[in-house]
C-alpha cells in the first residue's frame, strides 16, 4: 500500500469565512500561521525560531558591489554537506542569505565545483572545528581537502571575535538579527526554509537533525567580520553577483 501526503489550505475548507480566518490567525503564534492557513509544515512546541517565513523572506536581487560576502560550510557525508553564502550590507548591518547548497555522500571535489561559482577564488569560507580532524586515507585535515580544491577557507575554524563558538551563542545571534528584521533570506531558497521551520528543541536542547544549512549559515554569520567585497574588473557600480 502506497502512502502520499496531501497539502490542504483554507481554500479547501469553504465553510471558513473571512471573519473566521481572521479570528483563527489572531489567536495563532506568528510562526504557525502558514502551517494553519496554507498547510506548510512547521514545528509547533519547541521551535528554535518562532518566526514565519515572511519574517525572513525577500525577493532575490543583485547584490551591490561594495557589500561584503562570506561563505559558510558544514561538513558531512551520511548527513549532508551544506554551504551558504551571506551578503552583508554594513551600512545598515543587514545580512542576506543569497545562496545555499546541500548534498550528501559526495566528495569535496563535487562540493567545491558546485559552490565555487558563487563568488571568486578569494571568497572567504567559514568552517566548523571538526574540519581539523585528520582524514583516514591520507591524514590531511578535512578543511585542507577543500583548500586543496581551491577554496579560500579561513585560517581557523568559525568563532566570534571574543573566541566563543558555542551553538547557542550562534543561534541567539542569528535570532537577534532575525527579530530585528536584519537577517533576510532570498525567497526561493526552499531547502533553507524547510530547515528553518522544523528546527526545534527537545527538553530544552536543540535537536541536531536536518539543520545542515542552518549550521552553514551560522558559521558564516559568526565570521561575517571577515567578509570581503568581490574584486571588480569593471565599473564599481556593477553588481557583485547574480542570484
Stretches with model-predicted labels:
Residues 77:
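Short, glycine/acidic-enriched loop or turn micro-motifs at the edges of active sites
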Residues 87-91:
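Short loop/turn segments immediately following beta-strands, especially the blade-tip
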Amino acid at each position: 500500500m502506497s502512502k502520499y501526503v496531501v497539502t490542504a489550505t483554507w481554500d479547501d475548507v469553504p465553510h471558513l469565512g473571512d471573519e473566521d480566518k481572521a479570528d483563527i490567525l489572531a489567536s495563532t503564534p506568528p510562526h504557525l500561521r502558514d502551517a494553519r492557513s496554507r498547510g506548510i509544515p512547521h514545528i509547533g512546541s519547541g521551535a528554535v525560531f518562532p518566526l514565519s517565513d515572511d519574517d525572513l523572506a525577500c525577493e532575490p536581487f543583485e547584490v551591490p558591489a561594495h557589500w561584503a560576502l562570506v561563505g559558510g560550510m558544514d561538513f558531512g557525508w551520511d548527513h549532508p554537506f551544506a554551504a551558504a553564502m551571506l551578503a552583508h550590507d554594513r551600512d545598515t548591518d543587514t545580512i542576506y542569505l543569497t545562496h545555499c547548497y546541500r548534498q550528501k555522500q559526495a566528495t569535496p571535489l563535487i562540493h567545491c565545483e558546485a559552490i565555487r561559482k558563487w563568488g571568486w577564488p578569494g571568497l572567504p569560507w567559514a568552517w566548523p572545528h571538526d574540519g581539523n580532524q585528520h582524514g583516514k586515507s591520507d591524514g590531511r585535515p578535512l578543511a585542507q581537502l577543500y583548500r586543496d580544491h581551491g577554496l579560500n577557507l579561513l585560517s581557523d575554524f568559525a568563532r566570534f571575535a571574543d573566541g566563543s563558538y558555542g551553538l547557542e551563542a550562534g543561534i541567539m545571534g542569528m535570532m537577534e538579527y532575525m527579530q530585528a528584521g536584519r537577517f533576510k533570506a532570498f525567497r526561493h531558497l526552499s531547502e533553507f526554509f524547510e530547515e528553518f521551520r522544523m528546527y526545534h528543541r527537545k527538553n530544552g536542547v536543540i535537536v541536531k537533525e536536518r539543520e545542515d544549512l542552518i549550521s552553514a549559515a551560522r558559521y558564516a554569520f559568526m565570521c561575517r567580520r571577515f567578509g570581503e567585497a568581490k574584486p571588480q574588473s569593471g565599473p564599481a557600480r556593477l553588481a557583485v553577483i547574480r542570484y
